[in-house]
Amino acid sequence: MRAKSKWLAIFLVLGLILAACGGDGGEEETTTTEGDSGATTEAPTETTEAPTETTEGGDMGEIATDVGVDLEAGTITVGLLSDLSGVFASLVQVIVTGQEVYWENVNANGGIGGLQVELLPVDTVYDIPTTVQRYEEIRDEVVAIGHSTGSPHTVAVNDMLQEDGMLAIPLTWYSGWSDDAINANLMHHGVPYCLEAMNVIGYISDTMGDATSIAIASNPGDYGLDSYNGAVMAAEALGLEVVYEGEGAINAADEATLTEVANGIVASGADIAWVTTSPGAFGSIFGQALAQGYQGVWSGANPSYNPALIAPDSAIKDAMAASSYWSSYPNVWGADTPGIQEATQLLMDSGRVDQPISAYFEGFVEAQIMHAALQQAYDNGDMTRAGVLAAAKSLEEVDFNGLAPNESYVGSNNEQVQRVSGTIFRPDPEALASGETAGEEVLETNYTHPITEAFEFNSACYSLEG
């Protein structure tokens, strides 16, 4: 496979996995050893109290541990619930590589108080029962879960996470991860689909100046409906009439539904079309509407887009460039920020990266959140699983240095929820063809529209039942 074809294929899988991510223990012994600080963070009450032993830890002050931290071996083990051989393996492997490169650099520079972080990835095959099985297999070996692919998959293990008092970082942008009714053991990151819709539709409306109507269509499930609900709220706040309602109407595997949605958008004559689905389904809907003369401005949740839509051999590349706007969660490859530049250098120096794929940065973001939690737990003197979770939930700010918008894990739902889109961009086929970037013309960075800023977030925009 030629290099350009190879990375376009990976980009295609990127869009597919991010869309599909929103598809439709007993007592533990706790050991205390010598460490830098005797202060401990109060652990969540869900965990079972366990007997405590004390051992000597050399120069470290008193450090409490239970599962996944071995002070004698000098290791911290973090699990990854990742699709490594299923339909989204090529993308998840990129994200896992990002984590591996990040932690290799941390370990080479002293680790966490001299402790080396070891990743334990297990293959969930993007299957809910397998995710549960893999969790059960590693639950007695890891201090936390640094990556969990898929919203329903993460919900399926959430009760066990709470039983174990264990932290996990989901790989989706469902707004429920910012809802304290759901997220006792989960760490959100990135602007949720719901608020992303407000940012992007607000930006498009302001840019157009004269838009009065919008067509909205989506996949079913948390991914599509979280975004759909955000688009409806954006329309109301902006005074846009919703002239086509395709709530959960898209089945990416059923071409008939794509045609029905395309026809509905065309018939509505909407000024703006917000379509949240997979990239392949988006391309089909876009192309069919274009062929019928539709001239509105397009967008959707970020997973609806990937650069394959503007590849040199794409029949819709020029129309996509002329009539669509998008957002990103982390920043993009080539962005002039310290965080992006540092991550890019580490990736290129690793010898495992030869194409500009921004998905690596997602691995860095996940790893940096876990790094902050582990470091705080170490500083607190409590590296039990409950201690790591408590430390994570005490983080007032995780600063990504421009890699992505900073995150906070204290305060109310409304105070914690991410409102900032990493970038607003337009597709750039010429830049993509050059092979030097992923084809984004960045229009705004760290963007928050006034309607998003004013939105009162108290609970998930869409209820995903476990």
Located regions from the model:
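C-terminal motif of bacterial Sec signal peptides marking the signal peptidase cleavage site
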Residues: I17-A20
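Bacterial lipoprotein signal-peptidase II cleavage site
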Residues: G22-T30, S37-A39
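Solvent-exposed, acidic/polar segments of extracytosolic/periplasmic ligand-binding ectodomains
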Residues: E56-I63, D399-G466
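Extracytoplasmic "Venus flytrap"
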Residues: M60-E72, G79-E100, V122-P129, T149-P152, ...
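Beta-alpha junction/loop-to-helix N-cap segments that form part of ligand/metal-binding clefts
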Residues: I63-D66, S90-T97, N109-D180, H189, ...
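Extracellular/periplasmic Venus flytrap/periplasmic-binding protein
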Residues: T130, G176, A184-G293, G334-A335
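Extracellular/periplasmic ligand-binding modules, especially the Venus flytrap/periplasmic-binding
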Residues: P220, N229-V232, P279-S284, N331-S394
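Extracellular/periplasmic periplasmic-binding protein-like sensory domains
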Residues: A289-F364
